[in-house]
Structure formats: C-alpha cells, structure tokens
Amino acid sequence: MEEAHLLPAADVLRRFSVTAEGGLSPAQVTRARERYGPNELPTEEGKSLWELVLEQFEDLLVRILLLAALVSFVLACFEEGEETTTAFVEPLVIVLILVANAVVGVWQERNAENAIEALKEYEPEMGKVIRSDRKGVQRIRARDIVPGDIVEVAVGDKVPADLRLIEIKSTTLRVDQSILTGESVSVTKHTDAIPDPRAVNQDKKNMLFSGTNIASGKAVGVAVATGLHTELGKIRNQMASVEPERTPLQQKLDEFGRQLSRAISVICMAVWVINIGHFADPAHGGSWLRGAVYYFKIAVALAVAAIPEGLPAVITTCLALGTRRMARKNAIVRSLPSVETLGCTSVICSDKTGTLTTNQMSVCRMFVVAEAEAGTCRLHEFTISGTTYAPEGEVRQGEQPVRCGKFDGLVELATICALCNDSALDYNEAKGVYEKVGEATETALTCLVEKMNVFDTDLQALSRVERAGACNAVIKQLMRKEFTLEFSRDRKSMSVYCTPTRPGLVAQGSKMFVKGAPESVIERCSSVRVGSRTVPLNTTSREQILAKVRDWGSGSDTLRCLALATRDAPPRKEAMQLDDCSKFVQYETDLTFVGCVGMLDPPRPEVASCIARCRQAGIRVVMITGDNKGTAVAICRRLGILEDTEDVVGKAYTGREFDDLSPEQQRHACRTARCFARVEPAHKSRIVENLQSFNEVTAMTGDGVNDAPALKKAEIGIAMGSGTAVAKSAAEMVLSDDNFASIVAAVEEGRAIYSNMKQFIRYLISSNVGEVVCIFLTAILGLPEALIPVQLLWVNLVTDGLPATALGFNPPDLDIMEKRPRNPREALISGWLFFRYLAIGVYVGLATVAAATWWFLYDAEGPQVTFYQLRNFLKCSEDNPLFTGTDCEVFESRFPTTMALSVLVTTEMCNALNSVSENQSLLRMPPWLNPWLLAAVAMSMALHFLILLVPPLPLIFQVTPLSGRQWVVVLQISLPVILLDEALKYLSRKHVDEEKGRQ
C-alpha cells in the first residue's frame, strides 16, 4: 500500500477491513499470505563451485594459455629420446599456473560477503500482533506477518514490516531509521496523515519501516507492506538488478588479450607457411609430416613467447601491495581491480555526516543575558573549541579564555545541560576515543558541561574513563532528577523536575529545567536571568534574543539552537498529572530564560585542504545528504565545495527539485551540481547513472542499507567502517576511519599504482616482443632454435616477474595530484610509447639471436661454421659436402641457447633498471630510488645462475655453464640497451615538452 502515509489511520484500517482492537481473522490471514507471500526477503541463489571454477577461465589471456598448454601436451606425446621428459615440463608449468590462478579466484569469490544476504540481518525473527483468534497481544514469527496485521512495537524492538502508525501508547515515539534514511539522530513519529504524495521516507513521520529500531516509546501500527514490498525489499530488488561492470583495467587487459590472440595467430601462421619449403629437409628424415610438426612446434614456442604468462600474477601482486599501503591509510580495499580504478576517479560523491563532518555533535557557541533593562538587551556571547566528543576545549569570550564559574548565568546553563539530559560520554579504551551513549544532541550538552567545568573541579589526576563524566557528576550531586516530561511535537520541548540534595539548597525548593526549540521555549518565558537576578522579559529583549537565534541558524553557520530555561517555582509533583501528556505544556510555563546554545556536526579539520587537493587534481566533489538544503549548502561553503559568494542555482538541489527536472535537465544537473540535499536511495543511483553517461568515473560513499544499490552501481563504492554490513559488502572499499581524507589518499595511491603498472606492463611486453623477434628471426633465417619453450616460460614467469613486481614500488611522481584524471579508455600502449617499447623489444630479439650466432661463428670453443652453413644446418649430413668436417650434433649444443638465454635475461635486467621512470634519465632518477628493484634484479640473476649450475636444472632447461670470455660477450651485447632507452627517453622528453608547449 504505497499511499498509506497520505490517509488517516481509520481509512487505512478500512482498506484492510480490520479494527485496531480485533485484528485480522484467520481467514483474512490465509488470504493475505496467499496473495503477498511470506514476510521475508528471498535467499539469493549462490553460484555453484563448478560455475565459479569456469568463471576463472573466461579471461581471454587464460584461454590462450590453456590452448598453448593443450597443444604442447599433444606435441610432447610424440617426442622421442631425452627430450621426452623435458617436453612435458612446459604444459605442466602452464597448467599449474592456471590452476593456482583459479584456486585464488574461487577462494576470493567464496569468501566475499554477499550484500543481498547481509540484508537479512535486519529482519527480526519475532513480532507482536493482535489477531481475532486470540485475546490480547500474541508473539508470532515475523515471516508470518501479513499486510493488515495489527502490530505492536516497543523500545528495543526491530520493526517487522512497514507499518502505518495508528496509536502511540507513550509520550513520544522515537525511531532510529539511520540504516534506511541516513539520518544521524532518532526521529520522532506521530499518527497524523501527511497529505504529500511526493514525501520522501524522511518526511513520512507516520510510518515505521521494516528493519529500523524503536529508540524509545511504544506504539501500535497496521502492516501495509511485507517482504519484497517493504522499503528494505525495494533496496534488495535494486541491488539484485545491478550488473557488476568490469573495471577499466579488466577491460584493457581483455582488449590486450584480443589483440594478442590476433597477433599470435598471424605470426604463428606466417612462421609455419614461410618454412613449408623446409618440411622435407634431411633433418626430418625426408618426412614432410615430421617437418610440418617440427615447424608447428616452433609456432607453439612463438605463442608461448608472445604470451606474458607472468602478467596476471604481477598485476595481482602489485594491486595486493597497493591494498596494503591503502590499509595503512585507513582505506581497506575489498576488490583488487578497484585499486587501479581509483586512479581514474573524476567525481567523488560523498555523504556529509561522518565523512565530511565528524558525526560528533558539538556546541560551538552559547550566550547568556548580560543586561535586560527597558529598551536595551546585551548578551554575553562565548565560543567553544573542540570538534569531537572529547571533553577537551576552551570557552572564550572574544579572543580571551574565560573561567565559566565567574558567570552565574553559565553556572545555571551548565546545570540545565547536565540535568535535562539522558545521555552520557563514555571512553572506549579499545579504540582510544570518547563516544556518545544516547542522543547526539544531548551528548553535545554533556561534553559542553565538561569543557565549562563551572565548579573548577580538579581534573588533573583523573583517568580518561573518570574524566568522561566528572563535571556532570558534581552537578548531579547537588540536584536529584525526580522525573522527566518527555519531548512532544506540540510543545517542542522536554523538561526535568529536580529537587536539591544538599541541606543548604533545600530552601531554594524544587525546580523544573527546560530545553527545546528557541521560539517555543521563549514564547513561554515571562522573565530572563541576568547574572543571579531575575528580570521581566520585555519585547525588546525577546526580539533581540530571537534575532540572535535566527542569525546563528542561518547564513554560513546554520547552527542547531536550543533554548535553556528554568521554572523556579513549579507545582508540587504530587499535584502534577504525569499520565496526561497534554498537561505538560501547562507545567512548562512562566519560565525564566537562562541562555541558548548553538551546535553543529562540525566539518573534519583536514577535509577542506583535501577538497582543495581534489580540485587541483581535476576531481569534482559532490555532497549528497539527507539533511535539509540550508545546512548542506552551509557545510559546502565551509569546506570549499562551494565558494562563499557562489550562487547555488544549478549547483545545489533537493531530491524534490531534482525530480521536477526533465531527464535531460537531470543529466545536466549531475554534470554541474556540487550538492544534493534531502535525497533518497533512488536519487543516488540515478545520480551515478547520469554521471556514468558522461563517462565520469564515480566514487560513491555510503553507510546505510539505503546506500547499497548506489554503492554497487558506482565504479568505486566506498562504505564507512562504522556503517552497516550491507553497505560494506556492496562496496569495493571500506574506510576504517570514516574520513574523507582517506578517500583522497586512496585516489593518490590509485594513481601511483596505475603509473607503476604501466611501467611493468610495458617492461614485460617489451620482453615478450624480444622473444617473439628472436624466434621469428631464427625461423625466417633458418637458424637453430635460440630459445626453447621451457626457457621462455622461466623468463616470463620468474626472471622477468621479480623485477616487474618490484616496479610496483617505484616512488610516485611529485606532481601526481596535479594532473587531471586520466581517461579510463586510455590505451596502455599507443603511439610513441608503442614505438619505444617495440624498439627495445626488437633490440632484445636481435641481441638474443646475435649471442647464439656468435657462439656458432666466432667463439673459440664453438664450431666456427660459416653463416651459410648455419642457415642450412637442417641439411647437415655426412653425405653433404657443404658440411665436410663438421659434426652435425654441434647444432644441438646447449651453449648457443645458454648464450641467448643469458643475453635475454641480462638485457631485461638492464631494461628493468631503466623503468624506474617513464621519461626521466637514469641520471635524474637512479635505480637506487627503488631498493626493491635492485634486490629483485640481484635475485633474478641469482636464479639464472642457479639453473646454469645446479643439477638437474641444466638438464630441464637445456643449458650449460658459460666461461668468463662468454660472459664478457653477453655483457657487451646486453648493456647497449641502456643507451638505446636513454636516447628514446630524451626524444620522449622533447616530445612531451613540445606537446605541453602547444597546449
């Protein structure tokens, strides 16, 4: 029943053919259950283990590797001689890599919290209903409640369905509905109809929503929605309809996989076709089929060379290291790929309460009356420092600190704050912070009393736990609270009846202390306290006090003001009718105005500078809040989201104003707005959709159940550490300190990670280009294999993998937060950069082939054959006069492949040292700026020597130890790559500078 809030309670009952006293009949319950189903959220069917495993093989790069492993395995089955064992190493290694990758992927999926399932924690197990089959209230399972049921709720209960209130059985009914609406304080409810068909959930004060908690009071309501039809159920449907999108990095790697598969197919086919003329060479026994299979093996080796097998592992490691660095900055990343996405963030949509502000209500101003004579009224105004619940701060008058005990008015004000209060401060020793116990507004008053210390209590020797309530305790020793007249909507105030506890104070008699909305309280005041005197409240004083309250409540401050007053001679408590709340306003009359306090949820001190950094980095910050527009705009101005004098037309919208716009106007509003106030969950999702239509990468914060759909829809969903389990499980990142500054630090880390990722991806790809050039060149020229597949796997996975991972530790550029967000569709490698890494790769390939060729042609320990003989080595036989005096087995020696492998590894280590910076010279950014890289290079070289020297590794990798002379040649061939890359960097710097000059 969508319109329940519009109708009087009696009309709602008639719609369901039910009475508040009798409830539904068994027949009505049966019909309703058949029509609406059980009152529960359906369980989401999870993926089976088999489905999860198959998902891990959807990546194109993984499928290419799987195909290569399959072909290698088939070819290994046909090997003969000593190569039979080693031939199976390659497919085995590839399969082990894929299995490990799949295990990690499935484990992560299995351990990820399910956001939709987490919603079920807000479903109560039991409910209290009135039905005609039994007298009085009966407890039933919450899932059995149906629309039309008469439901009773009381303090501490979780609301079991969406209810339209029909009767409040206590003075007030307050509900904590923060999980649904994001409101930081509990909300007072009533039973009156709300004639507004467009009211948002925050304004539906006659409704109780499923999953929210009763903070105080007792009430009866009629269930108007159950299960998926509740507001909680609608959120579940929104979340279920959100399809997860692949991150920019995943999309780029997919595209890279597609390009790689096409390139591999073309190159492998070309190698095989080019060598058709060699299929029947004597080396293949004259068999055309054996020759075809031989060159097919070379094509497979080429495929293995072209695939950067270590890339997935290196990327995962780099992202994992990034998450650890982010965790140290209070940003806990739940989804690895989102680390890189943070670097693209162009819009941050942030909650106000707790993220941009401290969510710790603080009194920052107060006043008492200094003089109130005929025609004049002068106020003593004070400011109070401190933005948290910590009882630490100064009270100042102007610029001077004051001792509050010197002002009689402040002593009485502190007394009212301490006694007209049901909340307290508590020191959480585990967290090391002061926390509220009770209402935020009242806790702010408790904290104010501690800061004022009107009786000059000695606080030095107290522990933090004792300090939390020391000054309040002193006041409570002087007066005893007898009872409380709860807050009500009609009088907008609450009061306490107190009697003195000390003999010296008994003569003063009992007092009533009142706090509430200034207009309402001052209207009932007949006098005003000036120091210790009581002076009649004249019209001038009344107007001046109200003008000051209006001034504090508007403009740049928008403080929440509370008036504090005393009734010096209240009726005797025996004469008061406490069970009739309509009489409360009569008891709270003839009041004496004491003072006023102004409080706010203060902005976090560090946020303004972070927003300035975002602006410098080209990131737009948008505040989205459930608060009213005036408060939201004021906070935006204080933080620098809006300029002090900036016109808010087209920059700030309420949810209703946003709804009034056409779809095209809404899109435009999302592109220009800085503030959205009084919004509902659906608004957040629409804002994200509109921003995504402009290709903006959006980070969205949230903490309530209501935020989960938008968190799931945004590229980066950011949940608060203090938020609900639903929000956390729908988000990619959780802020352990709920602080906006941590988001900015995470964005900076994301940019640095992407910059480093580009370096190691290009480093790995240039290595693969070198391997492809090497195999392609040997195949075209008809030379013996310089590298075999198992060696290529070793280089791609291990010797290249370590430096590539270490490149993830490169220091970030100093100007990283001075650049605009990069386009998420920007290619990893394009244009000039592609040429640079192609040039390096071609050099690596040529150097590798040159090393193997040098051993055949020039090494004193080699055969010293001619280049012509080398190109025709497949025709070598005892009968061929071209090879007279040459042992044909020399062409199967391990020395040339060892030379080639050593040059490949050494060249790649030089290439890694060159990758500390994309464009800066080694002289400007030397390798020791990244000590991890130096360690990785040393480790890779050590592993290379390991496979050369330690049995049985030389047999597996088909290598052998080299002589000192041979190592000198390896270095001579490898080191020039540094000079080549330095030259390319120089050209790149000139190219970049010219581009900047043109811009």
UniProtKB/Swiss-Prot annotation:
Any single biological process term in GO: calcium ion transmembrane transport
UniProt modified residues of type Phosphothreonine: 19, 415
Disulfide bonds: 876-888
Modification N-acetylmethionine, positions: 1
Activity modulation notes: Inhibited by sarcolipin (SLN), phospholamban (PLN) and myoregulin (MRLN). Enhanced by DWORF; DWORF increases activity by displacing sarcolipin (SLN), phospholamban (PLN) and myoregulin (MRLN).
Extracellular side: 70-89, 274-295, 778-787, 852-897, 950-964
Protein name per the record: Sarcoplasmic/endoplasmic reticulum calcium ATPase 3
Species this chain originates from: Sus scrofa
